[in-house]
Amino acid sequence: MAHKKAMGSTENTRDSNPSYLGVKSYGGEHVHAGSIIVRQRGTKFHPGHNVGRGSDDTLFAKDHGVVKFARSGGDRKYVHVVPEEA
């Protein structure tokens, strides 16, 4: 038996960083323009009124208001931002 480990023993020590995906602002919460609402991979949630979609499918608020989650048609889920009235 070898008393020293063979080369390559530390091959499996790498790990990727966490993505921190999920809903960041829930329904009924107040958000400012530019606030991230959902971090996701793919379009589990689709952008609705006053909501934009980033290149990595992140949904963000385009206007100040209240977050609202809704279902439309089949199983498609939308996220809207209802503007606050001054």
Swiss-Prot record:
GO molecular function: structural constituent of ribosome
HAMAP family, sorted: Ribosomal_bL27
Gene3D superfamilies, per the entry: 2.40.50.100
Organism: Salinibacter ruber (strain DSM 13855 / M31)
Chain positions covered by the region annotation Disordered: 1-24
GO BP annotation list: translation
Keyword Membrane in annotation: no
Cross-referenced InterPro entries: Ribosomal_bL27, Ribosomal_bL27_CS
One cellular component (GO) term of this entry: cytosolic large ribosomal subunit
Disulphide-bridged cysteine pairs: none
Identification of the protein by name: Large ribosomal subunit protein bL27
Compositionally biased spans, kind Polar residues: 9-19
Coiled coil (residue ranges): none
PANTHER family: LARGE RIBOSOMAL SUBUNIT PROTEIN BL27M (PTHR15893:SF0), RIBOSOMAL PROTEIN L27 (PTHR15893)
Source organism superkingdom: Bacteria
Family recorded in the similarity comment: Belongs to the bacterial ribosomal protein bL27 family.
Keywords tagged on the record: Ribonucleoprotein, Ribosomal protein
